[in-house]
């Protein structure tokens, strides 16, 4: 009898091991993002780790990076291209973080929208627990030249892609990352987008975008990019020219406060970005000033996006002053579940 009981226990345990764990339930309800039927507030970071001296993304520091993210109270990572590495995805999930996966339009046939290979990625990973949202494009509204000079070509492709994802994965919302506020054409062309991401650089006061959003949509919205760099091209607003971590910290504090204060509308914020990107503006072996980004005159406090100075940590993972600011804001914020 004891042997029979032991066999039964072992058999039951084996069955449990063979049954895959169900991923968290992610859905949109009203203007809120829900995970397992509870409001989920994005305390996010944009993440594109390119090592010093290289130009291609590499996850060799993923363990260290995840520890730093957790310390800072970050719960969501936003990447600009799919991560086709189950070990990296498993580590993100094991760390208790969620992931917004971005798909580009034309990435030479690598999980992109043009070739429809992005659907292969979604089919492969749609049941992975790390996945929060599928995100299509990144501020493409600034680049009609990529679509034959007519941005409606992008909006049409976006609409088709949204419907295709809904057909194969009804369990994750579909988003797009739009450069600031979408106009009537963008909204009318994409009625099936579940949640909108907005890349917003309005100095250190992004809150006006939420009032504008409420006048045009009742769908949930998050800031897919916001923040400041740590280099002042000129002296301004009391901040000295040159590398200035204090300016970045002050700006990010005000930006985060402005978003958290509108948690009744905003589903969260992604600070741009986790680490400095030495590959962006010159020699990838050294940190250069300069670089360029569209519609970037609203970058605090000099109106100049020094592209290699955006990290909350530097290339060697040393914490900048803004790290502690973000940590304090994120760890001390709890979503009001009655909103």
Functional labels for PLM-detected ranges:
Residues 28, 34-42, 46-196, 206, ...:
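Active-site mouth of glycoside hydrolases
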Residues 141-147, 217-255, 271-283:
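Active-site clefts of carbohydrate-active enzymes
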Residues 173, 185-240, 266:
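Glycoside hydrolase catalytic-domain groove-lining segments
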